Amino acid sequence: MTRIGVEPSLSDVEELLKQKGYDVVRIQNEQQMDQCDCYVVTGLDSNVLGISDTTTKASVITASGMTADEICQEVEQRVQ
């Protein structure tokens, strides 16, 4: 199952992704950055949760300016 990490402030996105059948976890710390296939972040802070120097092979989607539906469509495209 595809695992999606989301920032805690994106609860609407979290719920919509769960409804679509994704395994969704809230990103709480740097250690979780290697546990997901895709991440959704707010983009309000370039140092997301203090992990600006973390690298990941997973897709990172910046949610700024997007609706929950648009974010879900972007997730679906990136995890195919």
From Swiss-Prot:
InterPro entries: UPF0180 (IPR005370). Belongs to the UPF0180 family. It comes from the Bacteria. It comes from Bacillus pumilus (strain SAFR-032). It holds the Pfam family UPF0180. Disulfide bonds: none annotated. This is UPF0180 protein BPUM_1317.
